[in-house]
């Protein structure tokens, strides 16, 4: 009797666990008895993935934390490589977590196992030479965005554009009234969503200019409401401190909720750069991007960044569809002018382009990923 399909798979954090879950479901539609083994979180385990280590082992951020965990990470890596070389899967997939997964992939590829890296690192934006590392470690890269594939093609590195899972998850039309109801926001009022980032360093840099922008907006639009999405209690306390300092008289509605509801409920959005800009584009809300980093990071970014723009909607459109105010340009005056313009116009051109781009990257990524991997196995 033919043995079932066997897939090695490692996800290093919660977002990877979600991608792994969708991938496993899609493969099982074609191969119901397929086996998955490696490292997964609760969602992958619920789909039948055997996890050899706790996913938390890999979810370390920041240089100091990584150094502290290095001996353990190296041990886990060695044990995984040993396991997979002794029990070779039909294919191995590393989901994101490139610092860990590319090292595992390199060893396995050298041992004759086909390897796939799911989610391209941002090689197109900075440290482009990493592409040679990726080429050495993988048989295939699965990319979320079309310009990523174009970059790999330039270097003849096998890459498949599978569309973006966010574009699949977000409907083509979003329901503003329902989102307002969920958040308890008045329906007949204009709302600006304020998204100052998810990291402490981002709130440190952006809370003040964003709050002062709201102050100016309130003078011009006395009835406007401000709703702020904050990822956790720490960020909430940080924002409250800045609020008390710079505009205690203003009324902000603070929400410990996903950015998605907050964006959906709004008429316009002022945000820090990041995945949230892509989410805002998919939800078809007019936005302005403001971003500041410390002087050293800014100096390095200027030299290392290879893209004209920092926000994904602009990189995707290859034009400045969304205004980006960075560093010294990220001022209350500039942000105020742009948000005022967004609130006073219908933004038709911007929103039509957002819809067009949503269609570009909405391809059923889970299914596309499964198809690409199964095709590689058959090669």
Swiss-Prot record:
In this record, what's one Pfam family?
Answer: LpxB
Q: In which pathway does it act?
A: Bacterial outer membrane biogenesis; LPS lipid A biosynthesis
Example of a GO biological process term: lipid A biosynthetic process
Full protein name: Lipid-A-disaccharide synthase
Which keywords belong to this entry? Glycosyltransferase, Lipid A biosynthesis, Lipid biosynthesis, Lipid metabolism, Transferase
What family classification does the UniProt entry report for this protein? Answer: Belongs to the LpxB family.
- What is known about what this protein does? Condensation of UDP-2,3-diacylglucosamine and 2,3-diacylglucosamine-1-phosphate to form lipid A disaccharide, a precursor of lipid A, a phosphorylated glycolipid that anchors the lipopolysaccharide to the outer membrane of the cell.
EC number(s) on record? 2.4.1.182
Q: What is this protein's gene name?
A: lpxB
What GO MF terms are annotated? lipid-A-disaccharide synthase activity; phospholipid binding
Superkingdom of this entry's organism? Bacteria
Where are the disulfide bridges? none
What is catalyzed by this enzyme?
a lipid X + a UDP-2-N,3-O-bis[(3R)-3-hydroxyacyl]-alpha-D-glucosamine = a lipid A disaccharide + UDP + H(+)
What is any one of the record's Gene Ontology cellular component terms? membrane
Question: Ribosomal protein among the record's keywords?
Answer: no
What organism does this protein naturally occur in?
Vibrio campbellii (strain ATCC BAA-1116)
């Amino acid at each position: 009797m033919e043995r079932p399909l066997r897939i090695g798979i490692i996800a290093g954090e919660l977002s990877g666990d979600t991608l792994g879950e969708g991938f496993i479901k899609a493969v099982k539609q074609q191969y119901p008895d397929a086996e998955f083994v490696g490292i997964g979180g609760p969602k992958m385990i619920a789909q039948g993935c055997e996890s050899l280590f706790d996913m938390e082992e890999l979810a370390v951020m920041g240089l100091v934390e990584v150094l502290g965990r290095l001996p353990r990470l190296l041990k886990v890596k060695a044990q995984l490589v040993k396991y997979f070389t002794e029990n070779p899967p039909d294919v191995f997939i590393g989901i994101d977590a490139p610092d860990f997964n590319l090292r595992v992939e390199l060893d396995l590829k050298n041992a004759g196992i086909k390897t796939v890296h799911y989610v391209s690192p941002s090689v197109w934006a900075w440290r482009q030479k990493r592409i040679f590392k990726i080429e050495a470690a993988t048989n295939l890269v699965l990319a979320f965005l079309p310009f990523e594939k174009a970059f790999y093609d330039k270097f003849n590195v096998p890459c498949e554009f599978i569309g973006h899972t966010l574009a699949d998850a977000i409907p083509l039309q979003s329901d503003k009234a329902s989102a307002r109801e969920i958040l308890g926001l008045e329906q007949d009022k204009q709302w600006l969503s304020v998204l100052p980032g998810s990291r402490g360093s981002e709130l440190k840099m952006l809370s003040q200019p964003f709050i002062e922008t709201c102050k100016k907006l309130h003078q011009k639009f006395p009835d406007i409401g401000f709703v702020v999405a904050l990822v956790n209690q720490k960020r909430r306390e940080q924002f409250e401190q800045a609020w008390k300092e710079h505009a205690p008289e203003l009324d902000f509605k603070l929400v410990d909720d996903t950015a998605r509801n907050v964006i959906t409920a709004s008429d316009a959005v002022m945000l820090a750069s990041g995945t949230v800009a892509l989410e805002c584009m998919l939800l078809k809300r007019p936005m302005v991007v403001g971003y500041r980093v410390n002087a050293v990071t800014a100096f390095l970014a200027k030299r290392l960044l290879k893209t004209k723009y920092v926000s994904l909607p602009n990189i995707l459109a290859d034009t400045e569809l969304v205004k980006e105010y960075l560093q010294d340009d990220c001022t209350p005056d500039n942000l105020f002018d742009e948000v005022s313009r967004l609130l006073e116009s219908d933004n038709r051109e911007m929103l039509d382009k957002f819809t067009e781009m949503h269609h570009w990257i909405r391809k059923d990524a889970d299914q596309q990923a499964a198809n690409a991997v199964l095709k590689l196995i058959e090669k």
